[in-house]
C-alpha cells in the first residue's frame, strides 16, 4: 500500500469514536427541585412509577443524562411528600421525549439544514388511589417546547439538554398549578397531616 492510500485512511480512534459515541454530559448543575417547598399530600404513600415511555428511534431524549423520563421522575421525587395516614398516590410519566422532526415543506436530507428541529414533550400525571385501587382524583400536566436542531452530534446533545432543562422547569410550574386546581382538597398546608378528605370529593371511574 503506497503513502497516498495510507493518508486516505481515517485514524482508528476516529472510527472507534464514531462507532460508540457516549451520551452527552450535562452542563451546569444537575436537574433538581429540592430547593422548593414540598407539595404535601394527604396520603400514606407515594409511588414514583419508573416506567420510561418509548417514543421511537428519533427520540434524542432517551440518550441524555438524565434521560427525559428520568428528569420528569426527579421532579416527582423532589416535589411530592406523603403527609397522611391512608390512601396512596401514584406519579406517572405519561410522555417524555425529544424528537428530531422535519419542518413542513422542507425536503433537505441532513440535520444541518434549518428545516429540522428538536421537539420536546413532557407529560406527567398524579393519581390518588383508595381501596381496591379505585381512583379518587388526579392531576395532569404537560408542556411542549422546540429548538432548532444541529448537524453536529455533540452540539445537538447540548441543545437537547438545554431544551430538557427548560421544559422540566416549565413542567414543574404547570404541575404545581394543576395540583392546586384539581387536587386542592388533598394538599396539606399546615404542620400536621390533615384528616381524611370530606365525603364530597368526587370519585372518577377508571
What function would you assign to each model-found segment?
Residues 2-7:
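N-terminal export leaders
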Residues 13-35:
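Bacterial Sec signal peptide processing site at the extreme N-terminus
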Residues 37-98:
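N-terminal segment of the mature soluble domain
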Residues 60-62, 134-174:
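Short secondary-structure boundary motifs at beta->alpha junctions and helix caps
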Residues 87-138:
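Surface-exposed short loop/turn segments
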Residues 154-206:
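C-terminal/domain-edge helix-coil "capping" segments
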Amino acid at each position: 500500500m503506497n503513502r497516498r492510500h495510507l493518508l486516505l485512511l481515517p485514524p482508528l480512534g476516529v472510527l472507534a469514536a464514531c462507532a460508540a459515541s457516549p451520551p452527552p454530559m450535562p452542563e451546569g448543575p444537575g436537574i433538581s427541585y429540592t430547593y422548593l417547598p414540598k407539595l404535601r399530600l394527604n396520603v400514606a404513600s407515594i409511588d414514583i412509577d419508573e416506567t420510561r415511555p418509548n417514543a421511537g428511534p428519533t427520540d434524542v431524549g432517551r440518550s441524555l443524562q438524565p434521560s427525559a423520563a428520568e428528569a420528569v421522575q426527579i421532579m416527582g421525587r423532589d416535589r411530592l411528600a406523603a403527609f397522611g395516614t391512608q390512601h396512596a398516590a401514584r406519579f406517572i410519566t405519561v410522555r417524555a421525549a425529544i424528537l428530531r422532526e422535519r419542518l413542513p415543506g422542507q425536503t433537505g436530507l441532513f440535520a444541518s439544514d434549518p428545516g429540522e428541529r428538536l421537539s420536546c414533550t413532557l407529560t406527567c400525571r398524579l393519581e390518588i388511589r383508595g381501596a381496591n385501587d379505585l381512583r379518587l382524583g388526579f392531576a395532569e400536566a404537560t408542556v411542549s417546547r422546540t429548538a432548532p436542531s444541529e448537524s453536529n452530534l455533540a452540539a445537538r446533545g447540548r441543545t437537547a439538554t438545554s431544551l430538557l432543562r427548560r421544559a422540566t422547569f416549565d413542567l414543574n410550574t404547570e404541575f404545581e398549578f394543576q395540583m392546586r386546581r384539581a387536587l386542592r382538597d388533598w394538599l396539606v398546608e399546615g404542620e400536621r397531616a390533615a384528616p381524611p378528605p370530606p365525603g364530597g370529593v368526587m370519585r372518577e371511574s377508571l
